């Protein structure tokens, strides 16, 4: 572990020197690239230096203990020595987690797709609740959300809705939402007070750079049409909505805002994200066939969470986490769940690196 940490610290120092070089400073691409890399190493280097300083402090205190005969000073030094010794395993544990390979997609913006599944109108209403929950959560992180495509339900909510979330580390925060979400509650129209169960599926796709996935113009079929809202009512009076079909795969992306130019850009962005996601899903399926992750397989059909309204309870089935905070969670306070899932995944990866042992 410490050989790795020495390499990280050496690279950090190299980056410091490079970021002082006028040739780098005057090249925006290189400046951004190296600044980003340095920022990613900063935490690891800070903790490693704290660890090394703590070990040095322990050696100094031990030397002072050998040299002194004063009882009061001995007592004080023993307390300091114990405090420093207690700090070491905590720093070592933190360093282990910091050395876990980072998901290369973590810093990317995302496309979130929510679809009503089983449950009819109630599922559509729940899809709307999930969209509101994620929008509120994005606000707490100062992320920007932008609706790409929406199909409203006649009785409220959405049959499906796609939206982008932009901000530093958006994928790292939202990637655990992939899967089937189940709600248990009494519908407003239910006179008998019976609890209904409905589901909605969530897909979180990392946005991609052009260099990461090639989409040739000749492989695209682009159609324009007049979009319609709930009940078939026309939202636009011109054919501004755009549908892009990737001919080799049959993958389709649409956008139906007012500007045709913006719709082309949005639809193409979603199309690329879906094609990239297909590659990721193939890789994850191969990986899942070899081992079971603590936070699930990432399969869209996997039931990951239940929202029980009568008991104000939210349960994440992947890690067995139950919180009696449904109201807060539906208001976008997802940190406790996201943090627990992040820790579970990191612990899982750490076990893998250590051949099954922590």
From Swiss-Prot:
InterPro entries reported for this sequence: PCRF (IPR005139), Pep_chain_release_fac_I (IPR000352), Pep_chain_release_fac_I_sf (IPR045853), Prokaryotic/Mito_RF (IPR050057), RF-1 (IPR004373)
GO molecular function terms attached to this record: translation release factor activity, codon specific
PTM text: Methylated by PrmC. Methylation increases the termination efficiency of RF1.
Cytoplasm recorded as keyword: yes
Compartment list: Cytoplasm
Modified residues annotated as N5-methylglutamine in this record: 233
Gene Ontology CC: cytoplasm
Keyword annotations of the record: Cytoplasm, Methylation, Protein biosynthesis
Pfam family, one: PCRF
Record flagged with keyword Protein biosynthesis: yes
Family under the similarity heading: Belongs to the prokaryotic/mitochondrial release factor family.
Free-text function comment from the UniProt entry: Peptide chain release factor 1 directs the termination of translation in response to the peptide chain termination codons UAG and UAA.
Protein name per Swiss-Prot or TrEMBL: Peptide chain release factor 1
Organism expressing this protein natively: Staphylococcus saprophyticus subsp. saprophyticus (strain ATCC 15305 / DSM 20229 / NCIMB 8711 / NCTC 7292 / S-41)
